[in-house]
Amino acid sequence: MNSFFGTPAASWCLLESDVSSAPDKEAGRERRALSVQQRGGPAWSGSLEWSRQSAGDRRRLGLSRQTAKSSWSRSRDRTCCCRRAWWILVPAADRARRERFIMNEKWDTNSSENWHPIWNVNDTKHHLYSDINITYVNYYLHQPQVAAIFIISYFLIFFLCMMGNTVVCFIVMRNKHMHTVTNLFILNLAISDLLVGIFCMPITLLDNIIAGWPFGNTMCKISGLVQGISVAASVFTLVAIAVDRFQCVVYPFKPKLTIKTAFVIIMIIWVLAITIMSPSAVMLHVQEEKYYRVRLNSQNKTSPVYWCREDWPNQEMRKIYTTVLFANIYLAPLSLIVIMYGRIGISLFRAAVPHTGRKNQEQWHVVSRKKQKIIKMLLIVALLFILSWLPLWTLMMLSDYADLSPNELQIINIYIYPFAHWLAFGNSSVNPIIYGFFNENFRRGFQEAFQLQLCQKRAKPMEAYALKAKSHVLINTSNQLVQESTFQNPHGETLLYRKSAEKPQQELVMEELKETTNSSEI
């Protein structure tokens, strides 16, 4: 990330046309330089020597303090132009001596006895005289205002993630009647999102506002592994929820998943997450950056820069692994979620309810509103997943495959990557809101867990589940009886009985929709 700040020390841009070459002016400058040396000071002492020059001397140099300052501010984004401004300010005689010295001597970059003017270019400190291109970066990568925006933004999603997912876990584990297949998937989603909040958000924020890796090699591997596993488990759980909802709505007559099967699927999710992220943990190492040092304070105290990064044998292997992660953690889950929710939406749209009778008309309007609400919810779920993770994966693919300029990479790493991470982690903050608090059963479980009373007393959840189970049995029995009578009377009454058989099946579909709406299956 910080490898795009520096430029080779040999690429200095000299501008001598602004300095007068008249013999009297050269002699005058040499006399001033000699008088300064006789007083015990250096031939050039930066801004102090500039202040000692008379106004006439500054006019003869063709520069004034204001002109030089404005020239510096206009060109501070280009290192070459910044050094050009420095060479303008150096007296000609002293500049010539230093040019000869640079050609004949090698300066020690860590020696305090040598003369090392340091200039701030994009918050980066450069040693102008150095045979080794060492770039000095500030410990904090951003101004305090920008860092405050990052901290507040990350703290907001961290707070929502921790509070929301903790409440979801508490509700599901506290109420035994909520131990259903879908709720177990939601519980697993909340656990993985909690891991994202604990291990991903603080470390990513720290990495985005300071230079280097402040922890050791063990923490580098553990944090990288846990971050990858938690993100992968969260995405895989979203796919499991989509498949479970798809089976309940599109194929309501097929056997549903059992609690035991749900536990097996959850174990498979975590095993897959560990397997796909293990190569990253193996390749993660803390490495010292040879050409960069961190400037810790205003007294020019510095320290080495360490990075926690993947050390692949070659760039092609890194590209292959990035592509595998992109396909398995974003592209394939996204395709499955869109396909499953698309099929659910089509099934809801095609579901028919009898239109005859005033009661049926009212039922139709109620069902129509429920269908619209459910379809909107499915669209929101799919769009949030797409928009949350697309920027981060796009940046990761661009970093590995696109031929970006150093300036583009610098902007991406310092400003765009923090926003992309924030957007991706925000998905873990909104998941408990979408999958938990938007359904009636979780609100009821929240009320029971914290013993809250509403104005209207509601039936106990166990009784509600029992009534739903009885209604399912009655609907299935009536459906089978009607189908049997249809086969026994294949002539004139077939159409009548076929219409009769259609109603229980549609009622069953709408009952499934109602149940999934209330128990997070839609």
From Swiss-Prot:
Keyword set, alphabetical order: Cell membrane, Disulfide bond, G-protein coupled receptor, Glycoprotein, Membrane, Receptor, Transducer, Transmembrane, Transmembrane helix
Statement: the UniProt record of this protein carries the keyword Disulfide bond: yes
GO molecular function annotation: G protein-coupled receptor activity; neuropeptide receptor activity; opioid receptor binding
Membrane topology: Multi-pass membrane protein
Record topology, Extracellular segments: 1-147, 206-221, 284-319, 399-413
A GO CC annotation given for this chain: plasma membrane
GO biological process, one term: neuropeptide signaling pathway
Location, primary (coarse class): membrane
Location(s), subcellular: Cell membrane
Residues bearing carbohydrate: 110, 122, 133, 300
Pfam families named in the record: 7tm_1
Gene3D superfamilies hit by this protein: Rhodopsin 7-helix transmembrane proteins
Membrane-side (Cytoplasmic) residue stretches: 169-184, 243-262, 341-377, 435-522
Keyword field contains Ribosomal protein: no
PROSITE patterns cross-referenced by the UniProt entry: G_PROTEIN_RECEP_F1_1, G_PROTEIN_RECEP_F1_2
Function: Receptor for NPAF (A-18-F-amide) and NPFF (F-8-F-amide) neuropeptides, also known as morphine-modulating peptides. Can also be activated by a variety of naturally occurring or synthetic FMRF-amide like ligands. This receptor mediates its action by association with G proteins that activate a phosphatidylinositol-calcium second messenger system.
Protein name, UniProt field: Neuropeptide FF receptor 2
Organism: Homo sapiens (Human)
Gene this chain is encoded by: NPFFR2
